Amino acid sequence: MSAPAASPALGAPLVEHVLARYRERTVAELLRHIPEQSPPYLYDLAADYPTRPCKGLRGALCLATCAAFGGRSERALNPAVTVELFHNAFLVHDDIQDGSELRRGAPTLPARYGVEVALNVGNAINLLGLRRVMANRRGLGGELAWRLFEETELMCRQSLEGQALEIGWIRDNACELTATDYYRMCLKKTSWYTFLYPCRSGLLVAEGAGADATRLDRFGWYLGAAFQIQDDVLNLTGAAEEYGKEIAGDLWEGKRTLMLIHLLERATPAERARVVRHLSLTRAQRGPGAAAEVAWLLDRMAAYDCVASAREAAAGLVAAAGREVGAVLAGAPEPPDEEAAQALAFLAALPDFVVARGR
């Protein structure tokens, strides 16, 4: 079949509709598998992040990919729950590592309950994700369950390696990074578990254990990098109410975003030394003048068009993702029903949605 055209005017409402429908199904199934009785501060808190307002992108992508390539989406519901559980566990641990104060419009688990409680909850959510991986054997058969386990192990390994890169750059005050370094981190930290893993899981459920699960990898890589850049841009420019996280938190935390790399490349020697000095200090070490330094960094990024350059890079990646997904969808089977047709249109429209979103 020919790839469905993605109209910008119709794309965003369609994407939001599909996200909402699949999120409702995924969250309901996820909550069914969280134990109701436990010691306090464990499973009760494991349900916190998944039930806060969010897109549910990863689970929806798994379900939509399955439907688009001839599968029944209900067979992919357990893998969709799996990716959402691992995602929320990563978020809890991210909030600990970053010292973040807000997540999805409310205090983070470490901010509200302390690091010790949050760390244990994150571990519990990972365990719940592992239990869902195990459940694939009963629901999908041993061969397909093993393929999904292999994909899960690969996703976790790549994500942890990406997180190690980012944490290491902050710890070592790395200030000689290039855009290539940033994209490598994006591929590992963001692309794998946000796009490649859900797409691969959906393809395997649709076509079986012998399927080529890599067909959407280039789409996932390009879109994952664009997604991360847009997330970084929103961190500096987003509306606090819609974004749901601390504005300019990346500058407080010293994260090496594409915009920060551009600033380090474009600043005068004196400005660059000031940036490096700011980055060398932890948030706790910066003292009462830190807010003024963050404001100065924002001003310098504006002066050197760092945000505009990042947006331009994201637009190029989105265009590449659109070409890749169009080529793959051209080989998809004719949609047998409305859900499959919407799933195909969802995948085609997703690239433009990624850079238009406000959270």
For each predicted feature, which ranges?
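Hydrophobic packing residues in well-ordered alpha-helices of helical domains and bundles
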Residues: 15, 19, 23, 76-82, ...
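Generic structural signal for well-ordered, non-membrane alpha-helical segments
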Residues: 15, 19-23, 54, 58, ...
